[in-house]
Amino acid sequence: CIKERKLSMKIYVDADACPVVRIVERLAKKHEVLCVLLSDTNHVIDSDYSEVIVVGAGADAVDYKLISLLKKGDICVSQDYGVAAMALSKGCYAIHQSGKWYTNENIDQMLMERHIAKTERRKTKKHHLKGPSKRTIEDDKRFEEAFEKMILKAIAENKDKV
């Protein structure tokens, strides 16, 4: 039973408009890791497996709540580079919905690129850019493979803490 599991690590998901929630839950269940989905009041999320935390609507409310809950060794699933940077600073693992791992080696570059893109949008006044392309089965497979590797690594490194 998962409630009896001694492994203290958890998976936290910034679940607002997150296309990989079900994949995360399936793998969390497979590996007996507790999962917490965070969303704001503008999104309705139901789960038979995960704990669901609903945070009041507001800019970055979910992000701040997620960061406050993270403990060293936990996994954070978010498409927000800022959230990922804060997760890494707490000794957590972080992954983007694309399957790309955020690391201490790549996060500064990603934040810089985000800043440059935002600055360019302000200069050109292009605020309504085309959204991401439609998610494919390959995207889901790529995420699933990368996420499972991350879970296995986190479990192996967290076993020492039990």
Write out the residue ranges for each language-model feature:
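Short, Lys/Arg-enriched N-terminal segments with co-localized hydrophobic residues
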Residues: 1-8
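Nuclease catalytic cores that cleave nucleic-acid phosphodiester bonds
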Residues: 10-162
